[in-house]
Amino acid sequence: MSLVPYEEGSLILDDPNSKSVVVVNPTSGTLSFFQQDNSNNDSELNEDQTASLSALDFPSGIHQYKSPIASYVCPQCGTEINPDIINRRQLHRRASAGVESESSRLSIPENTVPLGFEFANSSFSRRYFQSLERNHRHYALQNDSNNKQGQFSKNKYFIPDDLFIPGYFRKFFKILSLLGNGARGSVYKVVHTIGNTELGVFALKKIPIGNDMEWFNKCIREVKALSSLTHKSANLITYNHVWLEMDSSVGFVRSIDGSQSDSQEEVPCIFILQQYCSGGNLEDCILRKVFNRFSDTESPEERKKKFRTRKKNHGKSGEVGLSTEQLVSIIRDIARGLHELHSIGLIHRDLKPSNCLLLTPFKSDNENDNVYDREHNSDEFFPSIVIGDLGESQLEGESRLGTGCTGTLEFTAPDLIIQGRPVSSSTLPSRSSHTYNEYTFASDMYSLGMICYFIVFGELPFEPQLDIVDLKVRIKNFRFDTEGMIEKHQAMKLKPIDRRIFHLMDALLQPNNDARPTAKTVEETLDEMLINSKPGKKFWKENVDSTLNFSTISEVNENTNSFTDDYIDGDNVTLSLPAPEENLSTVSTQNLQKYSALNRTIQVCYKLVSMILTIIIFKCTKTGSWLSYMSLILLGMVFKSPADERGKHARALVLLAFIAACKKYIY
């Protein structure tokens, strides 16, 4: 199968071994499907039919062909067609209507994909959009030689005319919603369309450039970083396409005279098409769904709805925060993404929760009306995470050009902080003075440690309204106290977690960058925690007082071939712990599931036995006695205390019941 040019600038999805063809016509913006009658295979075709009828092989429908699955991958652009999502009813409807002529043209209903011609979003390769762009450019230039947009850009902006792709955005994309809006650009949820046929949903960054060469270079740096990933990554955002086009500006744009304005005139914009993550970003998820904090952007109706849901579920899930399983899933996904970035020599430099995206939405306990799902899945599952926004990334060894506040200051490593007010690159201390440090892979690891702190506590260790000078001082002086943080976690009455999470944070937040573990080491450490679990044991409480020994794990140079080259292959990857829809057959996941089921059974037994013992004590003692009061207190503690403390409270009830029985029947 291949994409080949056809008359009037059309594209044909073509396979020379079968008897059908799909034509994409940019002139009319339509898709057309042609198919040769299989019963006439032995007959002679005329020259025109032989030239135009080529095949798109389908596994079922009017005509069935037997061919390998590889025939559904275009060798020119790499785009996959999913043969399992074929609209069979549409095929049968057309078959019953007698559409079996030697060459029959089928119209495409609005907002539908013909004959199962459906693409998985991730299967759209960069070459597909490049082919579409070349075809669109050919048609646009052919029909509009006096390109008004090109003349306008030539007189006013530094970008050459031939870099613009006029009309590409409006021709092939429709905006569904606004995902985010900042001072320098916007992010939209868009659907890729050809005519009225919707082919996939993506996230699209539209960044006005104007005459700001520095800003243009920064945007191109992000594109180069994304382009350096030559294969599909499990935990890095997937980049699909980039192009330049004149469009109305959003935010501040530098004009030809160097001034800034926020006018709505058409200016050069760079469009970056990438993977759409329906779960939003990690920061919003933690604040709004995990710790139940209202967002400033939420409407009163949304807040009322959340309040009613929370009130309805009151008492069903008293603890907030994430479980150990969920924390490990998040940290491991981010560490994997960092490992892959570092393996190709890239430093992210702006790693923070808002740049970590959830592939699917996270459903909190308060949002889950299904009691079974809330009890069985909520503490074990968290959506897979990908790292996005590589606009600040740089190659290892490059000199920094800023103040040390490239991204959000709170997530910046202390060794990068330059004391005092922000300075420009022109006033940055010289390299020879050695008064500042360069970004390294360890800088990203400190950011990962601060992300760990944020997802554990739902906040950062700094006051939110600090002056920038005071904030720099706090960051420089911050030291992670493991025991103190464990006490803080207990005082906040969050879900109990494994102490090794705190030891991991301590290692990542070391002020000395040489003392921080690498992304590969963090990933291997978390995997080792899973592998060492034993069926039937308390999975996350085993070795609870032991510290993580990073020195026992071999340190590797991050700038090596990516480990994902060996075994990441499309969707056959376990990205989270555990995902119900994925085929998880690893030993660690089996152990985790066994522990979860056993632990739930034990907790229910503790509660039932405690209630029975309390009834026995009341029957054996007088009303108002100290034994009855103590039994009620212990019963309440059994229901309210963390799971790992219920056993000792239940044993205390057994002792009280024994004393009560002795007083009644012996004395």
UniProtKB/Swiss-Prot annotation:
Gene3D superfamilies: Phosphorylase Kinase, domain 1, Transferase(Phosphotransferase) domain 1. ATP binds at residues 179-187, 205. Its EC number is 2.7.11.1. The keyword Iron-sulfur does not apply. InterPro entries: CC_SR_Kinase, Kinase-like_dom_sf, Prot_kinase_dom, Ser/Thr_kinase_AS. It catalyses: L-seryl-[protein] + ATP = O-phospho-L-seryl-[protein] + ADP + H(+); L-threonyl-[protein] + ATP = O-phospho-L-threonyl-[protein] + ADP + H(+). The keyword Kinase applies. Pfam families: Pkinase. The active site is at 350 (proton acceptor). Residues 173-530 form the Protein kinase domain. SUPFAM superfamilies: Protein kinase-like (PK-like). The modification Phosphoserine is found at residue 96. Disruption phenotype: Hypersensitivity to copper sulfate. Keywords: ATP-binding, Kinase, Nucleotide-binding, Phosphoprotein, Serine/threonine-protein kinase, Transferase. One of its GO terms (molecular function) is ATP binding. One of its GO terms (cellular component) is cytoplasm. Present with 892 molecules/cell in log phase SD medium. Belongs to the protein kinase superfamily. Ser/Thr protein kinase family. This is Probable serine/threonine-protein kinase IKS1. It comes from Saccharomyces cerevisiae (strain ATCC 204508 / S288c). The gene is IKS1.
